[in-house]
Amino acid sequence: MAWALKLPLADEVIESGLVQDFDASLSGIGQELGAGAYSMSDVLALPIFKQEESSLPPENENKILPFQYVLCAATSPAVKLHDETLTYLNQGQSYEIRMLDNRKIGELPEINGKLVKSIFRVVFHDRRLQYTEHQQLEGWRWNRPGDRILDIDIPMSVGIIDPRANPTQLNTVEFLWDPSKRTSVFIQVHCISTEFTMRKHGGEKGVPFRVQIDTFKENENGEYTEHLHSASCQIKVFKPKGADRKQKTDREKMEKRTPHEKEKYQPSYETTILTECSPWPEITYVNNAPSPGFNSSHSSFSIGEGNGSPNHQPEPPPPIADNLLPTSTPQEAQQWLHRNRFSTFSRLFRNFSGADLLKLTREDVIQICGPADGIRLFNALKGRMVRPRLTIYVCQESQQLQELQQKHEDGDAVTSTFFVYHAIYLEELTAVELTEKLAQLFSISSQQISQIYKQGPTGIHVLISDEMIQNFQDESCFVLDTMKAETNDSYHIILK
């Protein structure tokens, strides 16, 4: 007797539906993705994932950053998926940047209850302009006397302490803040992007800038030099209300695009998150520079004597050449790259030791870094010095007379006398620079040199001027004669 198990009608319907769903789920295997389907590569290319990409080595990619900086201004919708976000700002308008503490419990306990220092900068985004940044900013200062590129709107800011703006650094501001308290700083950018374009005929595109923030903690000496975190974002600055018009124009252009074209662009975000970057190279090492205004003062007045009075300050040591050594570790090589303004390539060369970098040929570095940076890196690796604008050779007359007299007493021929000259290298070609170089040569203070003369025709004494030095022939030789001044303890020097 055959037994047959019959399912209820409802169970049969459920079983049939499950079979159809399973068949449908298998039917797409081996087929191409249609227009309505998606791939994981497209998902990973979305801006939310792209903005989280780190510019640091892989071992640091998964770490949570201690701080986060958020610029309260919308990003442009006309930026492609794989490009960095771009934010439009109005000239002179105050924009909030929120300083957020992202530390986990127990992270960086040494700054608990203490202040940190943040330095804000507006710098060029284009590498071409970075090379001439000093000249560009000096030109802006000349055209806009009394104005600054970057300012803090102090009345609107919250939680900032001791805000400062160096009068010589128009694009930099700094302040202290407590990470445990709410901190928001309002900044104003006063230059517009079109002020730095090469040709100004109207309608040209403005150059992009970067807002960079470097944060430091206090060291044992009370100086804020230990780097904690750096981040930056790309901006363009327009005349008042120009940023709003540009944002509206970009939005209207995107609305006219097809859905397929829109998928290639990032959506516009209400705020701009600054992404982590390398620290500004000059900041980390700024305190290694000697203090300005330090003058040596010795009482002796002969070349190479070097026995100054103990009551005066010793002569400052010569600057140490920052040459990369073959024995340098990869960590030391990274520090050397940052000090010499090659931070862009620090990740590329993160596993290179000093010997590895020094083995690179000129063609190697040009191929890796491009022509401009490649040549600069090659010259830095080889320690090539810039040729001075003017070189002169000097010898002290008293030494010559002593040697001539000694030769005469010994009965030797005068023509066999050997004189020692000292090289002086001039860059600025000014009388002040020559005075300082001669003071160093004689181991005295530059204030002890009253005047410098050049012996002219018929023995006349011509006062040295900037124009005269600029007309010196390169590698000219001079004999120095010194005379005591009648009024004080200074000296006159005569070039013969």
UniProtKB/Swiss-Prot annotation:
Q: Where in the cell is it found?
A: Nucleus
In Gene Ontology terms, what is a biological process of this protein?
A: mRNA transcription by RNA polymerase II
Chain segments carrying region DNA-binding: 133-386
Q: Where is the composition biased (Basic and acidic residues)?
A: 241-265
Q: Which sequence ranges are marked TM in the entry?
A: none
- An annotated GO cellular component: nucleoplasm
- UniProt keywords, alphabetically: DNA-binding, Nucleus, Transcription, Transcription regulation
State which tissues express it. Answer: Expressed in the epiblast at the pre-primitive streak stage. At the primitive streak stage, expressed in the extending primitive streak and in the prospective neural plate. At stages 7 and 8, expressed in the neural folds, somites and in the regressing primitive streak. At stage 12, ubiquitously expressed in the whole embryo.
Q: Which residues form the Grh/CP2 DB domain?
A: 61-300
| Any one GO molecular-function label of the UniProt entry | DNA-binding transcription activator activity, RNA polymerase II-specific
Any S-S bridges, and between which cysteines? none
Segments for region (Disordered): 238-268, 296-327
Under the heading Pfam families, the entry gives:
CP2, GRHL1_C, SAM_3
Cross-referenced InterPro entries? CP2, SAM/pointed_sf, SAM_3, TF_CP2-like
**Per its database record, what is this protein's job?**
Binds the B-response element 5'-CAAGTCCAGGCAAGT-3' of the ENS1/ERNI promoter. May be the major transcription activator thus being essential for its expression.
The UniProt subunit note reads as follows:
Component of the SSP (stage selector protein) complex, which appears to be a heteromer of TFCP2 and 2 copies of NFE4.
Q: Which family does it belong to?
A: Belongs to the grh/CP2 family. CP2 subfamily.
Q: What is this protein called?
A: Transcription factor CP2
Organism phylogeny = Eukaryota, Metazoa, Chordata, Craniata, Vertebrata
